[in-house]
Amino acid sequence: MYGPGTKFEKAMFYTRGPKEKQLLVNLASTTDKAVHARKRRIISHALSEASIRSYEVTILDKIQLFCKQLSDASTFGGPYKNMSRWFSYLTYDIMGQLTFSQSYDMLTKDDHHFIQPLIDSYQHSQLGTEPKLDQWGLAPLLLLRIMAENKKFRRYVDDQVNHRIALEKAGQGPPDIFKLLLEHKDKETGESMGFKELSDEAVVLIIAGRRFFSPCVNGSKRFTLNSQ
């Protein structure tokens, strides 16, 4: 992320090629400082102290359900649980509620469990592959499985965005994180974010909500158990 006083521009690793051909432009990947500053100002409202405190009830409800499901031998995995996966279920449910006001019920149902490996694959394509494969047009030829899974992931993200936009148009849009993006107006043009920009931001919200927090919790659990 660019800080307010950053003097250097992000490298081509983030754009995966020329800026004008960048496929994914969001808070995490944009190299344009002006664009990044605008996006950071929008999302900062969702991360203010007051906002974070307002999330407490939702987070505690999910944690209580998480503990209940873990102690039930009849839930996913039987009496022995894969804690890495279970922390992913927990954080994804929290992300869904806070970002899209949608309960994915990852802790109680397996309908959305398919998204977990798709997120892993998408992250690998962005962070674990050589950018020149994209620049030279070789990625679709050499990374067939990853590219196919990326398309599935982007379709899934588009579906979540369409669902949230439909709620807003129906006058049922709750005060969640995505509402900040839907209500944003460009100061110069007065225009709202287009679908492509909304979908790109949804990518980073979904991945950050599930992937970055879950390993932290999992690591804390391991440290605590090893300290006993």
From Swiss-Prot:
Disrupted gene: phenotype observed: Impairs the production of acetylaranotin and accumulates chemically stable intermediates or shunt products such as haematocin B, haematocin, terrespirodione A and terrespirodione B. Also leads to the accumulation of deacetylhaematocin and demethyl-deacetylhaematocin when ataS and ataH are also deleted.
Domain of life: Eukaryota
Cofactor: heme
Enzyme class at the top of the EC tree: oxidoreductase
Sorted UniProt keywords: Heme, Iron, Metal-binding, Monooxygenase, Oxidoreductase
Its EC number(s): 1.-.-.-
Pathway: Mycotoxin biosynthesis
Metal-binding in keyword set: yes
Pfam families: p450 (PF00067)
Keyword Iron: yes
Residues noted as binding heme in the record, renumbered to the chain: 216
SUPFAM superfamilies, per database record: Cytochrome P450 (SSF48264)
Molecular function as annotated in GO: heme binding; iron ion binding; monooxygenase activity; oxidoreductase activity, acting on paired donors, with incorporation or reduction of molecular oxygen
Family classification: Belongs to the cytochrome P450 family.
Function of the molecule: Cytochrome P450 monooxygenase; part of the gene cluster that mediates the biosynthesis of acetylaranotin, a member of the epipolythiodioxopiperazine (ETP) class of toxins characterized by a disulfide-bridged cyclic dipeptide. The first step of acetylaranotin biosynthesis is performed by the NRPS ataP which produces diketopiperazine cyclo-L-Phe-L-Phe via the condensation of 2 phenylalanines (L-Phe). The ataC domain of ataTC then catalyzes the formation of bishydroxylation of cyclo-L-Phe-L-Phe.
Protein name as annotated: Cytochrome P450 monooxygenase ataY
Gene designation per UniProt: ataY
